[in-house]
């Protein structure tokens, strides 16, 4: 899957936080965002993974504007595990990654061997 961000700008309470960010991340690539506190890294990511929908510019997943992707389909394509979480839960890293498979299953369906293999492959990449 390819991610392309074109001229992304985000303002919060009319204050510009991010201005003119463009980037491309190819299928299978890993990218790090570096910068000082308050420079807009988290704001950029929140726009990319739909936590903040108020932005200008374009965010494309495999060439498709994210605004045109249905929520369920977006959940199948993109999963986020935040660094900080206010909810105390007792899950292993593997169990949290496996939760990302939920949009690919039916309501009462359990994970399959294929899901387990996908999780193993994902964890092997990091």
Residue ranges and their predicted role:
Residues 68, 84-98, 103-109:
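Conserved catalytic motifs of ABC-family nucleotide-binding domains
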Residues 49:
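Helix-to-loop junction immediately C-terminal to a conserved catalytic motif
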Residues 34-36:
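The feature captures the beta-strand-to-loop junction immediately N-terminal to the Walker
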């Amino acid at each position: 899957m390819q991610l392309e961000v074109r001229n992304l700008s985000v303002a919060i309470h009319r204050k510009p936080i991010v201005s003119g960010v463009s980037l491309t991340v190819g299928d299978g690539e890993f990218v790090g965002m570096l910068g000082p506190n308050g420079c807009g890294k988290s704001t950029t990511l929140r726009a990319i993974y739909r936590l903040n929908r108020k932005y200008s510019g374009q965010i494309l997943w495999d060439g498709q504007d994210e605004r045109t992707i249905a929520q369920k389909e977006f959940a199948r394509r993109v999963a986020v595990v935040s660094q900080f979480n206010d909810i105390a839960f007792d899950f292993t890293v593997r169990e949290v990654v496996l939760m990302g498979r939920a949009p690919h299953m039916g309501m009462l369906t359990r994970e399959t061997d294929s899901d387990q293999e996908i999780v193993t492959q994902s964890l092997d990449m990091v």
